[in-house]
């Protein structure tokens, strides 16, 4: 790979459909009945937290001092209609990272079986609840991306994609809330490597890239690769439309 005169972070897509959804909710709020208002207000809090978390990650990426292409909020569907909403796709010279942003309130414990438990404190009381594994969620997204890449390819090209996919692509779950404490003392090594705090993101990316034995891409190849994801992106977000329709019922 040719050496860049200066490391360059290129944000190929920064727009976030969550912001558009937030605007819809804020517009709807004053017109809503009291019963619906409560649901909308809770949804607004959740969406604002998610946007703040993604902004934290975007800040880290923009200041990474690395050569990379960044795409935010990408939605990819397979031909049979299964979809994956990916918070960030980051293309570096050797590895592409699929980043799931979690701006969770409370502290997170991960046990030896990979179970995630959140503890939230209200006053003097502590409440614990199990949450769906963000690792499983992100890896399912990656499987959908892989299957979308296999579509319309011949047998040989498909075999190459299958063989190289997990060597070239990595899943990272980033806890974007700076107040969240992550307790992964009993978690397996592979879990610890996939769940990190936002302030560990760039160090983690640099370490994985440095340890990779994959050949380096040129800047032109990185751009073409990033643009291939952008071409697959669909702006019609079923998840937000369905949420909005549910709130307005």
Go through each PLM region and give its residues:
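Surface-exposed interaction regions that form or flank ligand-binding interfaces
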Residues: 1-84, 95, 121-249
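Phosphate-centric recognition/catalysis
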Residues: 87
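Active-site beta-strand-loop-beta-strand hairpin of nuclease catalytic cores
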Residues: 90-118
